Amino acid sequence: MNLEKIAVINITSFGREFPKHLQELEERVGPVDKMLLPADMDGEALASRLKGYTYVLLGNYPSFDEAFFSRNQDVKLIARHGIGFNNVDLESSRRHGVYVTHIQNYVELDAVAEQAAALLMAVSKHVVIADRKVHEGNWNKDRQELMGFQLRGCTTGVIGCGHIGTRFAMIMKYGFHNRILAYDPYADKDKVMAEGIQLCDLDTLLRESDFISLHANLTENSRHLINAEALAKMKDRAILINTGRGPLVDEAAVLDALKSGRLSGYGADVAAHEPMEKDDPLLTCDQAVITPHSAIYSYTCMKNMNRKVMEDIYCMQRGERPVEIINGL
C-alpha cells in the first residue's frame, strides 16, 4: 500500500478530543503530522515545509498563495477546517489543480449562533467585568456600574441571513421575543420572511436595532461594512456582535465609539488580525468582550467538522471528487 502523508496545520483540537479520528487517518491513509505554523509564513517557505505531503487540513492561517502553489506539486487537497477560505488563493489553487474544500456553515450553525447569543448576553449584562470584581474581592463595590440591558422585547438586526444568521435570529426571536430585522442582498427572501424576519436596507437596520450581529461573508464590498459612518447611524448605546469575520468592522472606529459611549459594547469571536496581539488597543476596553475564534469548539460541532475533512481525503483516495469544492475544479 502506497502511504500518503497528511499535514494538519494550526488545528490544535484535531486528534485531542477525538483521538480515534487521528488513528483512523493514520490507518487508512498514512502518517499524520500536526503543525503549528506562523500566521505570516510566506508561500515559498510553506511550499518547502509541505514537500511530500498529499493532503492538508488547514486552520485559519497561514495563507496559501501563488508563491506556494507554483513551488509545491505534492499537495493535492487543501481541506479547510472551517467555513471561511480567505487564506487560500482560489484562482491559483484551481490553476495548479489543487482541490480546495471547506465546511458548510450548517455544520457550525448551532455553535456559532449560540456563541453570538452568549457574547450578546455577556456584553449586555457586564458578565466579564462583574466576574472580575468578585474575583478581586469587590462583591459590594460599585455594583451600580454593572447596570445592563434587558434583552426581552428589543429589536435585533442581523447582517448576513444565511444558516448561522437565521439560527441566531431564531434564538433572539423566540428566546427573547425580539423583533428581527435583517440586511442581506443575497438572501432567499421567501425563506427569510417565512421565519418572521423583516428584510430591510442597511440604514434602516442600523437606525432601528438595539443589537446588531454580523454573520456576513468577507468580500471587498463587505470589508469595513461597519465603519465610523455606519456607527454614527446606530442607536445610542447599541451593542455590536461579530462572529462573522474580523475585517467586517473597522476596529479603530469601534474602539472610538466605545470610548465615546456611542456604542455600549462590542462582542466578537473574530479579529481583523488573528491571532490578536496582547497589546491590541481593543483589548484595553472593558466594554469589549473578545473570544479567540473559539465559537466552533463544541464537542458536537468539532466531531462533525473532523468527520467532514476526513471524508474529503477518503473521496480523493477512491478517485472521487470531494464535496464542497470551492475553487471550481
Predicted features and spans:
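N-terminal glycine-/charge-rich "phosphate-binding" loop or analogous flexible N-terminal tail
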Residues: 1-53, 181, 190, 317
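Rossmann-like dinucleotide/phosphate-binding beta-alpha-beta segment
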Residues: 18, 144-236
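An anion/phosphate-binding loop that grips the pyrophosphate of nucleotide cofactors and donors
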Residues: 53, 72, 208-209, 237
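Phosphate/diphosphate ligand-binding glycine-rich loop within oxidoreductases
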Residues: 53-131
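Short, well-ordered coil/turn residues at beta-beta hairpins
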Residues: 58-59, 81, 215-218, 243
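Rossmann-fold NAD(P) dinucleotide-binding segment
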Residues: 63-75, 221-240
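Oxidoreductase and adenylate-handling cofactor-binding alpha/beta cores
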Residues: 113-132, 174-178, 308-315, 320
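Rossmann-like dinucleotide-binding domain for NAD(H)/NADP(H)
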Residues: 237-329
